[in-house]
C-alpha cells in the first residue's frame, strides 16, 4: 500500500521533477520492499529479547547447553535468539540438526566472526574457525593428509606405545603407592599427561608430558583464557548492538581490549616457544575421565568391559593394536560416554551464507547455527530407553556410530566441518582407556556412592567436570608386568 501511494504521488508531479524525486525516494522504496519481504518470512519462535544484549543474559552461566535445552523445551527444537548484534538459531533435535548440517551443508559451512575469536586465531587462520573458502580447504587438506588421515592414525601406534613405555614407570609408582595405601588418586593430570605426550610424539617426534607444559599452571591458565575468549559470545562490546566505534571504546574503558591483547600475547609467546622446541600444545581436556566416572558408577558395566579387555589381552601385560579391534563392548562404552558427555556440547557454530529453511522455518543469510549435541544425546525422541542413564547395551540393537553418519549421535559434528581430528582422538581414547581398565581395578572412594557422584560439567566451548576425577585403584595381577 505504501509503495502504491508513493507511485501515485510520483506520477502526479511534473515530469521534469520525477527523476530527481525518484532518486531521493529509492532508498525508502528498497527498505519498504525488504520490510514487506521480511514480514512474509516464517521465523522460528524464541524468547523475548532485551536491548543491546538480545538473549545473551539467558546464557551467562557456565552451562549454556543446559540453559538452551531448557529454553527449547518452551520454544521448540528450532529456536531463534539474538546474541548481541548476531542473529542465531539453536537446533535441539536430531532431525533439525541433520537437515541443517547435511541437507544445507554447503549453505552453512562457514564460521561466524567475533572480536575475541578474530584476535586469538590470528585473523581466523585456525582451521577450526577459518571461514569457508580456498584457504580453509587447503589447510584442512594439508592437516588430513600429513597428520590425521587413517593411514597416519594407524601409523601413530608407535607414539601411543612409546608414551606408555615412557610414562608407565611414573604411573606405576603413583598408582602402586595409592594401591598400597588404599587411597584415591586424582586421575585428570595422569590422563592429560599421557594425552599430551601422544599428540606431541605424533606431531613432532618429541614427548612433552607431565614434566613440561601439562603441569605448567601459567600455560593451563592461558589455555583456559583462550577457550573463554573463543566461546565468549557478547563478552566484547563490539559484539553487542552498538556502532563499531562505540564498541571499541567501551572495550577499552572496561579493560576487555587490554585483557584480549594480554591473552593473545601469552598465546603468541607460547607458540613461539613451541616452534623453537618442536612441541604441539593443541589438546582438549582428557575424554577418558568421563568413561571412568560412568564406569565406576556402574560396577556391572565396569566388570563386563574389563573382562572383555583382559580376555583379549591375555597375559601380554599391555594392550596391543590388534586387541583394540576385538573390543566391541569397549567401543559401546565410548559411544555411550560421547552421547552423554560430548566434548563440545554446543558444536562450533556455523553461519549461513544464504537464505535456507530448517523444519519449515526461514533462516536468513548471516545467521549463526548452533547445534546442542548435549541435548540431542539426551533427547527421548532419539533415545527412548532411559536417555539420562549410562547404558552401553543400547548400542547392541543398532549400528549408530559417532562418525557423523547418524543424526542421533554427532559429538564431532558432520558434513564439511566435521572435526578433522576425530579418528586420532578416538584412537587415543580407546587405547588409554583399555590400558587403564586392563591394569587396575577401579572403585569409588570410601563414603562415595554412585548416587552422590557429581556428574555436572562446566565450560562453554569445551566442557570438563566441575569436580576432579578421583577413584581408588587396585593392581590387577597382569596389569603391571
Regions found by a protein language model. Give the residues of each.
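Terminal signal-anchor or tail-anchor transmembrane helices
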Residues: 2-40, 427
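Cytochrome P450 heme-thiolate "Cys pocket" and heme-binding signature region
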Residues: 359, 396-429, 456-458
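Conserved cytochrome P450 K-helix/beta-meander segment immediately N-terminal to the heme-binding cysteine loop
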Residues: 371-401
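Cytochrome P450 heme-binding "Cys pocket" and the immediately downstream C-terminal segment
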Residues: 299-301, 422-464
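Cytochrome P450 substrate-recognition site 1
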Residues: 40-62, 66-159, 182, 186, ...
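Conserved cytochrome P450 K-helix E-x-x-R motif and the immediately C-terminal K′/meander segment
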Residues: 56-76, 320-360
Amino acid at each position: 500500500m505504501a509503495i502504491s501511494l508513493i507511485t501515485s504521488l510520483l506520477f502526479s508531479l511534473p515530469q521534469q521533477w520525477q527523476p530527481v524525486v525518484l532518486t531521493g525516494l529509492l532508498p525508502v522504496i528498497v527498505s519498504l520492499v525488504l520490510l514487506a519481504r521480511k514480514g512474509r518470512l516464517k521465523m522460528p519462535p524464541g524468547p523475548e529479547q532485551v536491548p543491546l544484549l538480545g538473549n545473551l543474559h539467558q546464557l551467562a552461566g557456565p552451562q549454556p547447553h543446559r540453559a538452551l535445552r531448557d529454553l527449547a523445551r518452551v520454544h521448540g527444537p528450532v529456536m531463534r535468539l539474538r546474541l548481541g548484534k548476531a542473529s542465531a538459531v539453536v537446533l535441539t533435535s536430531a532431525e533439525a540438526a541433520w537437515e541443517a548440517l547435511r541437507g544445507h551443508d554447503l549453505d552453512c559451512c562457514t564460521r561466524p566472526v567475533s572480536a575475541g575469536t578474530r584476535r586469538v586465531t590470528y585473523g581466523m587462520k585456525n582451521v577450526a574457525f577459518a571461514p569457508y573458502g580456498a584457504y580453509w580447504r587447503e589447510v584442512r587438506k594439508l592437516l588430513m593428509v600429513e597428520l590425521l588421515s587413517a593411514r597416519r592414525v594407524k601409523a601413530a601406534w608407535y607414539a601411543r606405545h612409546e608414551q606408555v613405555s615412557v610414562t608407565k614407570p611414573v604411573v606405576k609408582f603413583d598408582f602402586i603407592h595409592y594401591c598400597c595405601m588404599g587411597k584415591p588418586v586424582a586421575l585428570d593430570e595422569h590422563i592429560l599427561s599421557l594425552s599430551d605426550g601422544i599428540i606431541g610424539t605424533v606431531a613432532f617426534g618429541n614427548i612433552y608430558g607431565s614434566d613440561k607444559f601439562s603441569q605448567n599452571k601459567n600455560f593451563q591458565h592461558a589455555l583456559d583464557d583462550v577457550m573463554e575468549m573463543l566461546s565468549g559470545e557478547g563478552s566484547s562490546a563490539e559484539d553487542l548492538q552498538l556502532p563499531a566505534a562505540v564498541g571499541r571504546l567501551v572495550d577499552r574503558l572496561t579493560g576487555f581490549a587490554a585483557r584480549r591483547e594480554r591473552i593473545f600475547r601469552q598465546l603468541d609467546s607460547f607458540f613461539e616457544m613451541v616452534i623453537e622446541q618442536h612441541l604441539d600444545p593443541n589438546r582438549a581436556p582428557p575424554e577418558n575421565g568421563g568413561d571412568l566416572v560412568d564406569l565406576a558408577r556402574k560396577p556391572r558395566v565396569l566388570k563386563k568391559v574389563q573382562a572383555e579387555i583382559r580376555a583379549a589381552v591375555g597375559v601380554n601385560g599391555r594392550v596391543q593394536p590388534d586387541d583394540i579391534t576385538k573390543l566391541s563392548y569397549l567401543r559401546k562404552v565410548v559411544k555411550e560416554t560421547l552421547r552423554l558427555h560430548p566434548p563440545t556440547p554446543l558444536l562450533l557454530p556455523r553461519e549461513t551464507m544464504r537464505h535456507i529453511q530448517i523444519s519449515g522455518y526461514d533462516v536468513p543469510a548471516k545467521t549463526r547455527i548452533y547445534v546442542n549435541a548435549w541435548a540431542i544425546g539426551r533427547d527421548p525422541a532419539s533415545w527412548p530407553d532411559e536417555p539420562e542413564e549410562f547404558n552401553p547395551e543400547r548400542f547392541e540393537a543398532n549400528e549408530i556410530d559417532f562418525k557423523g553418519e547418524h543424526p542421533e549421535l554427532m559429538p564431532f559434528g558432520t558434513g564439511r566441518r566435521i572435526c578433522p581430528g576425530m579418528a586420532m582422538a578416538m584412537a587415543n581414547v580407546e587405547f588409554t582407556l583399555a590400558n587403564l581398565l586392563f591394569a587396575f581395578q577401579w572403585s569409588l572412594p570410601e563414603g562415595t556412592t554412585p548416587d552422590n557422584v557429581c556428574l555436572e560439567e562446566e565450560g562453554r566451548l569445551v566442557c570438563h567436570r566441575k569436580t576432579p576425577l578421583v577413584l581408588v585403584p587396585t593392581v590387577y595381577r597382569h596389569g603391571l608386568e
